[in-house]
Each structure stands twice: as C-alpha cells, then as structure tokens.
C-alpha cells in the first residue's frame, strides 16, 4: 500500500516494509529484506569509544536519545545540519554537520582545496591524508563536528555523471585507498568524517522527485539503480569497505533507490551489507531530504535524519516526536533507538569531539556579524552569529602542492618545461581568467565564468581567493623580462589568431563543468549533456593551433572530455589536464609549466574517442511511466578501463597514463608466496540487542512547560499523551503485521555472516598472501616521481582483463633505482561468490602485471596458487 504524500509526511509509523516494492513492470528487480538492524558492539579499535557511548546513553531519557537522531530543521541553527542537544549531560549544543568534501561550504576565511578527482590523479596516499587532515583542522576550528565528506559515490560508472569530481576514480581500488586515507586525515584532526553517497548514486538526473518535477518530468519516485550482488561487492561496495576498515564515523545514505528500495530505508544495503557484513560501528545519516519514512527507515538501519524536516522549512518530521511515539507504541523497539544513540556517540568519542569541541563560530546563512539565532523563521535571540575566525593556517602551500602533483601531462613534444626565456607568451581562453562576478559570485559555484577551479553544488567551498592561470603566468613572464598577451574572451577568435601568430608559445585554457542536480547550467542538469568542451573550447584550440606551431593546451574539467579531433594536431605540442585544483590553481599550473615541479600525475579515468566508447548512456528520460526511472547496471563490473579492455578498444589516453619530464624503466619482477593463514568464514552469533535505560509513560515526554516553542523547529517531545493525536497519522492503529517486516523488531542473538566478523569484513580477507617486487629506474636526466601500478588478472571467463590492486608514488633522482615492494591480500585475489555469500579465490590461473599504466605493463608473471 502506498500513502499519499501528505499522509506520509505526517505519519510516525509510516510504511515500514521499505524493501518490498511493487514495480510497474514485473521484471524489475526488488531489494530483498534483511532484518533486524544489527546493533553496534564496539569491535576492534571502537571498543573504548563504544564503552563511553554506552555509559552516557544509559543516562539519557528517551527524548534525549531521539534528539541526537533528528536534525532540528533546515536553517534552524548555524550549520547545514544540526541535531538536538543533551545539555543535562554536557552536550550543550547539537552536533554540527557541514559540507563539503573539499572544504567548508557557506563560511568564510577557509580554504578551497583541490577536488577529490585531483587527489586521485596524484595517486599519492600521503597527500590524500594530509589534505584530509588539513580540511579536518579547518572544520574543527570552525566548531564543526561532522564533515560531510569524502565521497566515493558516485564511483564513476558514467563519465558524464555530474558529481564524479567529488569522488576519486571509477576504479574501486584507487578510490578505496585514497578514500580511506582522506578519512584518516579528517578524523585525526578530531572531526567525524562522512563517507558518501552510499550507494549507487551514479547520476544526478531523477535523484529527487521534486527536483525532477521542477525540470518538467512527471515522476513519482526517484531513480532506481539496479545492480547484481557480484557487481555490488566487487565494484561499488569495495571503497566503502575500505572506509569502514579505516574507522569512518558516519556514512551518508543516498537519494536514489537501490533495486527499487530507497537508499535511506534499504535494509539490504544498510542492515546487511554495511552493518552486518562490513561491521560498521558508526552511524548512518540521511542525505538532505533523502529520508522517506518513519518506522520503515528506523528498522532498515538509518540512525540520523538530516536536516530533520521532511521538506526544507516545513516543520514536519518523520522522526523527532514521531520517533518518541514509535517507541512508546512499540512499533520501534527501544533497543533500536538506543543503538542509534550509541552509534552517534561512539563516533563522537572515537575522534575526540569531547576534548576538542567549541560551538560553531559561523553562520551558514549570512556573512553579517549579527543575525537571528534561528534564521529560517527569524526567531530567537538577535546575536553575534559570525566570529570571522580565520582557519586557513598554512594550507595554501599544501593546496598548491596537490594542484601541481595532480596535473597530468598527456602530451609533450619538446614544448615543456618552458624556459622562462620566451619573449612573447600568448594566453588564450576564458578559462585562464577571472570570473567577472568574483570567485564566489555564482551561488554554489553554479556557473562557468572564468577559470574552473571547482565545480558546482553542495560539494563546494567558498574561495578565500583564486589565483588564475592568467595572473600566475603573467607574473612569471614579466619577472623573466618577457611580454604577455592574454585574450580571455572565447568569442575573440580574430584577436586570438593575431596574438597566436606572434607568440613564442601559445597557452590555451579550456574547461568542462558539471555539478549537483539542483542547479542547471546551460542545460546541464548536474550531469553533462556531452563530453565536449564548454564555451566554444574546441574552436578556441583550433584557432590558436592554426596560427601557432607551439600551442600548449591546459584542460580544467570534471572528468574526461573528447579530444580525438585535435589532440594529434602537430601544432599542439603539449596537453595537460589540471582538473579542479582549488584556490592555488594558477600557481599550481605555473609550477608545472615552468618545470619547478616535474609532472608525475596519472589520469584516474580513461579518455575515450567517443561517448559511446564508455558504454551505456545516462538515464535522461523517464523509462517507467510516472514511476521510478530504472537504471540497470547491466555492464556489471565493466566500467571505464575494464569496459575498454573488454571491447578491445584503444583509448586516446588509458587509465593510469601520464608523462613526465624524465623517463622510467621497469625490471626484475619477483613474485613470492607468503605463509598466509587459511581463510576462515566468520561463525557464531551476536549477543542480544542491548537496552540502555528505561522507557517511561507518554506523560514523561510531554513538551516542557515554560519552554518557548520555536516555529517549525523539530522537537522530540509529545503534544499529548494520546499517541494517535500526537502523531497525527491518519492510519494510526494498523496491526504490526500489516507494515512491519518479519524479524524487524527481533532483538535476540543473530547469526554472524561468513563475510563479516570485523570492521571492513572478515579479517582474514586482509591477510597478505603474495609479495611482489619490481625495480624502478629513473632513466632520464631530471629528478621526479613515478607511480608504479600493479594489476591482477583474476582469470575467470567473465572477469576483466586486469584490475588495479596496488600502486605507489616513488621519488627517483636521475639514474637512481629503487625496489618497490608490495603485497597482495586475499581480498585482492578473490571474487564474490553469490551462492556462497562469501569471498572465494577461484581455481582459475591468475597473473600479476606491473607497469606505468593500465595498458603499459611490461612486467608480468603467473601468481602462485593460494587460498
């Protein structure tokens, strides 16, 4: 049965069987139920924090626990999301969650870091960690408890997906390692990291009903990403396993449906995969307005509702007082709310929030010094809301380093590095210059004016400044006594031709933008319409190249673009991809162009000749009547380079490719089996669901006398001892059997899954089985970094040709040799067995490959048989 939207909006005991969907067409997949929601047990490094959480939650009343689980409403307090508080026990203000994965959104005096996709291009674990730690320091200094990042969803199934730049790479191993290092950095700075968007959030269009309807599409449910179990485990779940193993405190569930069940009430993905199989000990928070039911979401594994209201500023909540009603009437077991509160407080203690916490010293809603305490309704005290705390520290230096380390040299025919002696330097393209409205002149960066250093949406930050390529290069040229001629209007082709014909070197800057689906730029509804350059970029390149035989092209983009029609033009002597480098953009690219930094970046995605080279297109039209658009992941694990390999298609630039100002050689591959332990499937049962504290009567949870009620603020208290009246649910009184799934409220001991047993999954998955070493030699005349990459062939008839498993970034002086040594774990060599519901190393022969990209693998050897 489906409720009307209004009925759903006011119910506290809404349809709980969140995984039973009756699709319009019978062949559509549905997500199997998995209940009850596993309770945290403090495994591994979580033990101390878990015990402290249990101690404080045991002292909380029901409404205090509920207050931790529910945001107070959009724009009700300083942060984009803020829970209720528990002042009686020292939590004097609610937990503050704030965007984004690359810096602080809606703030000031903060840094704008390079995007996640740039971190992936560095292939550098240390830089990923340092960037995470620097961001965490800034969030902590602003009084933020929870950073809403990093992202591994979207992973990158679609090269034109709107938010792939927020994450890292379409390869799960590369993403997983850098995802985990970023999380460690953020949390070592004392801030809870949020791994998002869990899971299969691979496109923007149709992610939300109201958003789609605003664009003229009459759908009633959000898009469903339909995936098989093997693909889920081997591709999309892989980096989230790394995040859980790294100790991430929060995971954000996504807007989309997974196999026709909403991401924030999908018991298969939340209860089974995340909490039972991966042993996640932190809390699951909803994406903003991705919460679709009361009891259903609670039983399916959601722990925190953000921002608390159903629609922004409507004053209604699935949880809050409705959660209190649900516990009192027995539809939500008390142990489930206890577990929510324990999970939240465990993450809080694990990162040290109790030691480091200061109140938020900024307002997301105004840059003015003073404003109302509750901005959405202009109520509460008129007070100082912005302290203008500068949190940037010395992070500009790191930002510049990551920017240059992530610049991929795709082509170089003797053009680079520049000598500094070039007498006339032409700079071409709007992407070289400033946004005439200012670097933050477009709300949420929702435009493409000037140089592209950050894409658009909630995954953004406010620039403290933006060094453009024009500024940095002009300074360089003038310092060296040269002349510089910028033409930064893409329509000025005549002027470009004139300047190019006179220039010693012509530097062309072009871009391609994308972002979140609530903003449309030039008809790009978050996702890109195509993979071409924006603002006449191809014509700018062709114009300059036809008048200059030393044309260097620099691309700022959110992902791959089509370069096949111009990349091999002999007048184009160099091509660089600089991604989205953040505030130090110009300085970063100048460091590479002038040779202060030897480029070492490798492309974290494949550059195809056409959009069709990548496989299935985005779902851009409803394909299920007015119901949920269906996105079938029928390609399985074959995305990006795996898909190109399967089709034997030669890309323009393969995954992992990147040039240097020096050269490297690979030799002496050695493969040695280790005495790894035998794989032991997890067995046994959990303990029973623990309960902390006691539950009183409805009268104990009435709205406190004398407390001034703020309009639309989400409270945990009841308005009446009549639970039906307090819930305002027109369907109140249904029998539990009508809407509560079987076993959903069962708090008895539960079997431990074979693939589970510890955070990240079965601990024997991570045992080293094989040691691999290779010698890397700098055969050139310039010191530099090389990124050795290790790929494995898993051998099965339906497996990718190779899959990335290990990598590193190694510095070598001219002529220097180093032996790179790494290991392969059981997980690296295993496949997911759907029938056994476990990881299995198959009988098929396996091989290991080492080289500088997915297509340049000069070293190869068979792998020994291991189990």
From Swiss-Prot:
Active site, UniProt feature: 287
Listed Pfam families: Fn3-like, Glyco_hydro_3, Glyco_hydro_3_C
EC numbers, comma separated: 3.2.1.21
UniProt keyword annotation of Cytoplasm present: no
GO terms, molecular function: beta-glucosidase activity
Record GO biological process: cellulose catabolic process
Keyword terms of this UniProt record: Carbohydrate metabolism, Cellulose degradation, Glycoprotein, Glycosidase, Hydrolase, Polysaccharide degradation, Secreted, Signal
Annotated glycan sites: 67, 218, 259, 322, 329, 361, 449, 530, 549, 571, 675, 719
Record GO cellular component, one term: extracellular region
Catalytic activity: Hydrolysis of terminal, non-reducing beta-D-glucosyl residues with release of beta-D-glucose
Annotated function: Beta-glucosidases are one of a number of cellulolytic enzymes involved in the degradation of cellulosic biomass. Catalyzes the last step releasing glucose from the inhibitory cellobiose.
Family from the record: Belongs to the glycosyl hydrolase 3 family.
Protein name: Probable beta-glucosidase A
The species this protein was found in: Aspergillus clavatus (strain ATCC 1007 / CBS 513.65 / DSM 816 / NCTC 3887 / NRRL 1 / QM 1276 / 107)
């Amino acid at each position: 049965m489906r409720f009307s939207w209004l009925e759903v909006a006011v119910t506290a005991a809404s349809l709980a069987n969140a995984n039973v969907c009756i699709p319009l067409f019978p062949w559509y997949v549905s997500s199997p139920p998995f209940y009850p929601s596993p309770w945290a047990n403090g495994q591994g490094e979580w033990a101390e924090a878990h015990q402290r959480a249990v101690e404080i939650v045991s002292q909380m009343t029901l409404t205090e626990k509920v207050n931790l689980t529910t945001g107070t409403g959009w724009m009700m307090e300083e942060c984009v999301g803020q829970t209720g508080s528990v002042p009686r026990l020292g939590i004097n203000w609610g937990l503050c969650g704030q965007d984004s994965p690359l810096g602080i959104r809606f703030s000031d005096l903060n840094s704008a870091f390079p995007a996640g996709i740039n971190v992936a291009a560095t292939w550098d674990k240390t830089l990923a960690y340092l960037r995470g730690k620097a961001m965490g320091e800034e969030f902590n200094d602003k009084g933020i408890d929870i950073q809403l990042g990093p992202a591994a969803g979207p992973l990158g199934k679609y090269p034109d997906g709107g938010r792939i730049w927020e994450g890292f790479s379409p390869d799960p191993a590369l993403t997983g390692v850098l995802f985990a290092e970023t999380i460690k950095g953020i949390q070592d700075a004392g801030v809870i990291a949020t791994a998002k968007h869990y899971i299969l959030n691979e496109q923007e269009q149709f992610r939300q009903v109201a958003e789609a309807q605003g664009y003229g599409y009459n759908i009633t449910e959000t898009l469903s990403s339909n995936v098989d179990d093997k693909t889920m485990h081997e591709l999309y779940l892989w980096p989230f396993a790394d995040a859980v193993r790294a100790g991430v405190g929060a995971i954000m569930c996504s807007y989309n449906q997974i196999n026709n069940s909403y991401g924030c009430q999908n018991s298969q993905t939340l209860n089974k995969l995340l909490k039972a199989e991966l042993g996640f000990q932190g809390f699951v928070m909803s994406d903003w307005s991705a919460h679709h039911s009361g009891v259903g979401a609670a039983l399916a594994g959601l722990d925190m509702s953000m921002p608390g209201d159903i629609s922004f500023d409507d004053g209604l909540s699935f949880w809050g007082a409705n959660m209190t009603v649900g516990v009192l009437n027995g539809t939500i077991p008390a142990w489930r709310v206890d577990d929510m509160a324990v999970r939240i407080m465990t993450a809080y203690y694990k990162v040290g929030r109790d030691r480091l916490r200061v109140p938020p010293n900024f307002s997301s809603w105004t840059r003015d010094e003073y404003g109302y305490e509750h901005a959405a309704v202009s109520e509460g005290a008129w007070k100082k809301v912005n302290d203008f705390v500068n949190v940037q520290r010395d992070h500009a230096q790191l930002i510049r380093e990551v920017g240059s380390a992530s610049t991929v040299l795709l082509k170089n025919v003797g053009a680079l590095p520049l000598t500094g002696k070039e007498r006339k330097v032409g700079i071409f393209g709007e992407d070289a210059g400033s946004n005439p409205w200012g670097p933050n002149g477009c709300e949420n960066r929702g435009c493409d004016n000037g140089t592209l250093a950050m894409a658009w949406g909630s995954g953004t930050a406010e620039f403290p400044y933006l060094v453009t390529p024009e500024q940095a290069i002009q300074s360089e040229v003038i310092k060296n006594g040269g002349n510089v001629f910028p033409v930064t209007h893409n329509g000025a082709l005549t002027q470009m031709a004139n300047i190019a014909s006179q220039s010693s070197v012509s530097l062309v800057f072009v871009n391609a933008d994308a972002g979140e689906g609530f903003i449309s730029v030039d008809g790009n509804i978050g996702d890109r319409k195509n993979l071409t350059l924006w603002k006449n970029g191809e014509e700018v390149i062709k114009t300059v190249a036809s008048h200059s035989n030393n044309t260097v092209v620099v691309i700022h983009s959110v992902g791959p673009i089509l370069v096949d029609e111009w990349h091999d033009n002999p007048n184009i002597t160099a091509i660089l991809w600089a991604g989205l480098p953040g505030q130090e953009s110009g300085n970063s690219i100048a460091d590479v162009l002038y040779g202060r930094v030897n480029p070492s970046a490798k492309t974290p995605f494949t550059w195809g000749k056409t959009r069709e080279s990548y496989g299935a297109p985005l779902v851009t039209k409803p394909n299920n009547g007015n119901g949920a658009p269906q996105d079938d992941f029928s390609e399985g694990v074959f995305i990006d380079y795996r898909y190109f390999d399967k089709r034997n298609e030669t890309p323009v630039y393969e995954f992992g490719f990147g040039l240097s100002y020096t050269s490297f050689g690979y030799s002496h591959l050695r493969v040695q089996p280790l005495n790894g332990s035998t794989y032991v499937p997890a067995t046994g049962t959990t303990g029973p669901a623990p309960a902390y504290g006691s539950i009183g009567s409805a009268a104990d949870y009435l709205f406190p006398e004398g407390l001034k009620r703020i309009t639309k603020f989400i409270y945990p208290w009841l308005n009446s001892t009549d639970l039906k009246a307090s819930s305002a649910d027109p369907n109140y009184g249904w029998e539990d059997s009508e809407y509560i799934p079987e076993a959903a409220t069962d708090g008895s001991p539960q079997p431990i899954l074979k693939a589970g047993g510890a955070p990240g999954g079965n601990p024997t998955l991570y045992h080293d089985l094989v040691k691999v070493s290779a010698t890397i030699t700098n055969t050139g005349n310039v010191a530099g970094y090389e990124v050795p990459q290790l790929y494995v062939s898993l051998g099965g008839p339906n497996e990718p040709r190779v899959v990335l498993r290990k990598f590193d970034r190694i510095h070598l002086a001219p002529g220097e040799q180093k032996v790179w040594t790494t290991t392969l774990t059981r997980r690296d060599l295993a496949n997911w067995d759907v029938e056994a519901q476990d990881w299995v190393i198959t009988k098929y022969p396996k091989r290991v490959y080492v080289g500088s990209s997915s297509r340049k693998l000069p070293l190869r050897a068979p792998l020994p048989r291991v189990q």
